[in-house]
Amino acid sequence: MNKTTEYIDAMPIAASEKAALPKTDIRAVHQALDAEHRTWAREDDSPQGSVKARLEQAWPDSLADGQLIKDDEGRDQLKAMPEAKRSSMFPDPWRTNPVGRFWDRLRGRDVTPRYLARLTKEEQESEQKWRTVGTIRRYILLILTLAQTVVATWYMKTILPYQGWALINPMDMVGQDLWVSFMQLLPYMLQTGILILFAVLFCWVSAGFWTALMGFLQLLIGRDKYSISASTVGDEPLNPEHRTALIMPICNEDVNRVFAGLRATWESVKATGNAKHFDVYILSDSYNPDICVAEQKAWMELIAEVGGEGQIFYRRRRRRVKRKSGNIDDFCRRWGSQYSYMVVLDADSVMTGDCLCGLVRLMEANPNAGIIQSSPKASGMDTLYARCQQFATRVYGPLFTAGLHFWQLGESHYWGHNAIIRVKPFIEHCALAPLPGEGSFAGSILSHDFVEAALMRRAGWGVWIAYDLPGSYEELPPNLLDELKRDRRWCHGNLMNFRLFLVKGMHPVHRAVFLTGVMSYLSAPLWFMFLALSTALQVVHALTEPQYFLQPRQLFPVWPQWRPELAIALFASTMVLLFLPKLLSILLIWCKGTKEYGGFWRVTLSLLLEVLFSVLLAPVRMLFHTVFVVSAFLGWEVVWNSPQRDDDSTSWGEAFKRHGSQLLLGLVWAVGMAWLDLRFLFWLAPIVFSLILSPFVSVISSRATVGLRTKRWKLFLIPEEYSPPQVLVDTDRFLEMNRQRSLDDGFMHAVFNPSFNALATAMATARHRASKVLEIARDRHVEQALNETPEKLNRDRRLVLLSDPVTMARLHFRVWNSPERYSSWVSYYEGIKLNPLALRKPDAASQ
């Protein structure tokens, strides 16, 4: 069999159509497929003429009228995006110097926006009312938190062993031996550090406690009259003048899962009858060439199966500027002016049509809302770790989300996905300038969502959480190490954001959001320092002789004291703050029904197991987050390349590599404390033994087999597992379908396979006008690639080839026309098997 016959056999067409094609050479085949009978100056450009025919062979249902167009050079091109209508979107430079801002105000140059002027009188009154209520509520929260912290800190001071604070006079130590002075001061310096850290950490815990408590009351009693969800009935028709874009920025994601969730979401939107009000944009920043080709294939299949031509678009950026935020900004500049709203989706997001329509209705009912964040529910994972986290977020999450809404109202959080945004003010106010300066906290902003919410609020637009709007879903990391990789990015981003704490015009609530974002990770090293100082104090107490006389001519000694009853009382009250939100959560479930959680006994047992699990993981996260914070401040780059895992499980080798130092620290800490004082080891036991067990917990919790076993036992059961909503059922069904027809080694198939080459050629975006310089560059790229083995062709060079329709056509022609010359490519491709279902429907392929 010659190569021409093999080439024809690779086409997904009937035998009669194959027989009609010429068998003489590859060029003749392309000429026969070219309905326009074009002539090409170069022989290896002939595949460009057959692109349309090859696309129609493989994806006939994806090529509606107008889907295939001509570029400026007459080459066939898939119209994957609508015509751009550009808008101006540029950032204002950050001004973080409060002295400079004060000087501007003195000179009358303060340009703080007067946003209320755009509202009607009735809207202004409503706006002022909830803002006043929100301010009062937050003052109450501040008073409660600080009062609780002051009482607890004073209580902590009374139970520390060294109580000679008032007798220490530095002037009395002048002329005294330095070592004696140091030993006198050391216990009190340690205790001072302990008290300061205790106050900060207790304040942090207290704020969370009051947030959960108010969320509990909110959910138990019913709606707050200031809830944004109360502003609509829920069945109002959508305004046809206000169109919404569903945008999904992706980067090297699981293609099968991305398009399964997106299809389920779109099918749900169609079921509402409101699909005409929505468009979908898949905004790819992927830089893995194999994934890029797989995305193109999945997009073609998606628009064919849902009839999405003209409504579902795909674009891959060649210049990945500013990561996700830059991708969204790029969409806004090119197509944002065509839409009133946009809903940002993550790669794992799934939303029901009712939820999306509900968000649009809320936007239309609240003309001063800039961002409305839904409350996504976690579901869809099977590992023990993920199921435990899903259960925790499903049980405790509603309390904290409702509590956040209670305290913040329309000056709330935006989490970067599953939220609707008013496009015009976003374009005008939410472009992000890079942070000035040098170092690890300068440059492009990493955690863009909090900053965009702060800028939206600074411009006078509300940022709300629709915490009681159902139908919003996401997925969690499958194991601890994957979660920590994500935390590494979030930690750095939140630390960077704190530089904006003093930026001009930021609302106090969003300054507090920046502070809480930092504390989410800074609390870890603070907790570690608290434990270290407590241990050091115990070492001093055990190994040194107490200083009974701190002043000259002191009549009575100062005895170190130990008051275990007070220590236990303080410990118990702190535990109440930590664990009462969990108890309130389970009380709420007991009151409203436990059936969807497996019943009374199973949900209670699941709660106890989750508490144990969180106790085991807290010290592990503490140490990792401490490393993340320190590395960010020191400018260290933490390299974390985890191996690919088919079942999302952590291997023993990787676990001991990541957790080995923690295990060693736990052993040394435990042995040292046992040697010094067994009683103190009792207090440290939850921490040191968690560190010792960390590799074992990490591995076992990452196993899907263990997670599925708990699912069969109805432990960690959530409503989405007990009675899955249709959109999640569809996601699983589409995911299985996509996996059956998945495409691996996409770049090599785009070079060799006639159908995938046509797809890559038609979707290539580097469509320059002809020039001699460009032709020389193209020939150089093609020759250099073919003169090397495919294994040596790196990612960036593959992307350059994949982005140019001419280079893809020439590569395709040469490997088929001269297989002997490019034998290394041919032999490499022969070792790759194309999924037989990749080019046709599974039922058709099996016939």
Swiss-Prot record:
Q: Where primarily located? A: membrane
GO term, biological process aspect, one: osmoregulated periplasmic glucan biosynthetic process
Periplasmic domain ranges by topology: 161-193, 534-569, 626-679
Q: Which InterPro entries match?
A: Glucans_biosynth_gluTrFase_H, Glyco_trans_2-like, Glycosyltr_2/OpgH_subfam, Nucleotide-diphossugar_trans
* Transmembrane domains' residue ranges: 140-160, 194-214, 513-533, 570-590, 603-625, 680-700
One MF term from GO for this chain?
Answer: hexosyltransferase activity
Where does the UniProt annotation locate this protein?
Answer: Cell inner membrane
> Which pathway does it take part in?
Glycan metabolism; osmoregulated periplasmic glucan (OPG) biosynthesis
Provide the membrane-side ranges marked Cytoplasmic in the record: 1-139, 215-512, 591-602, 701-847
UniProt keyword terms in alphabetical order: Cell inner membrane, Cell membrane, Glycosyltransferase, Membrane, Transferase, Transmembrane, Transmembrane helix
Q: Coiled-coil intervals in this record?
A: none
Q: Which domain of life is it from?
A: Bacteria
Please state the Enzyme Commission number of this protein. 2.4.1.-
Q: Which PANTHER family does the UniProt record give?
A: CELLULOSE SYNTHASE CATALYTIC SUBUNIT A [UDP-FORMING], GLUCANS BIOSYNTHESIS GLUCOSYLTRANSFERASE H
What is the recorded name of this protein? Glucans biosynthesis glucosyltransferase H
